[in-house]
From Swiss-Prot:
Keywords: Hydrolase, Magnesium, Metal-binding, Nucleotide metabolism, Nucleotide-binding. This is dITP/XTP pyrophosphatase. Homodimer. Mg(2+) binds at D74. It holds the Pfam family Ham1p_like. InterPro entries: dITP/XTP_pyrophosphatase, ITPase-like_fam, RdgB/HAM1. Substrate binds at T7, H8, N9, E10, G11, K12, S75, F193, G194, Y195, D196, K230, H235, R236. Pyrophosphatase that catalyzes the hydrolysis of nucleoside triphosphates to their monophosphate derivatives, with a high preference for the non-canonical purine nucleotides XTP (xanthosine triphosphate), dITP (deoxyinosine triphosphate) and ITP. Seems to function as a house-cleaning enzyme that removes non-canonical purine nucleotides from the nucleotide pool, thus preventing their incorporation into DNA/RNA and avoiding chromosomal lesions. The active site is at D74. The keyword Nucleus does not apply. CDD domains: HAM1. Binds 1 Mg(2+) ion per subunit. Residues 201-224 are annotated as: Disordered.
Amino acid sequence: MQIVVATHNEGKLVEIRRILEEDLGVDAENIELVSAGSLHLPDPVETGVTFQENALLKARAVAIRTGLPAVADDSGLIVDVMGNAPGILSARWAGAHGHDKANNALLLAQIGDIPDDKRTARFRCAAALVVPDTEAGADVTGGVAADGITVHTTAADGSTAPVHARYAIKSETVELGDMPGRIIREARGEHGFGYDPLFVPDDQPAGRVSTEPDHEGEPLTSAEMTSAEKNAISHRGKALKALVPAIEALLH
């Protein structure tokens, strides 16, 4: 069975594949994960006001177009003293999307006078699975058949015009996962991305502490953890783990 991951980021596809197929025991032989980017599907505009809404929006867009089950996630950082900001704006908190250094610098400036015991935060992820109703068939613009993956372009008059299928939705599932922790005052670590260098998770790997100069023996940031250590406690891993029963149900 093919499942489309609603992303154009191949790194995220690899991470989700690893979590689902290895860490969580989903049968790799029966599931082929493909990215929306590899199918040349456009990114939908994220108009939701919650992580759940945006995850569902992205998964729906893919399932409707392809006729295949779709998985999507939306995640970000919630800082308690900032009224749960940056939230859904985490990736573009400083203006430009994905500018990690600028986002981190702005966050540190905004909570610079907050004492350490009040710098609590959490990463939150919403993971969604949307299953299309393929038995009902698809509405097809242009009046010719479409298989959901191949976009047919043969029009009745012999010209070429893009044709897109639109499948109805059969079911939707969305799950949440949190990784609680706190924001430190300067970046540490070379792994991860986003706010990872500023975030110290509450759950720490046994026997491992920071070796950074002036911070020896302190708890690790997300960016100091290995991928396996981070996946074991991550918000995305927790949300996807909660989604596994719904994915496994598709195989039976």
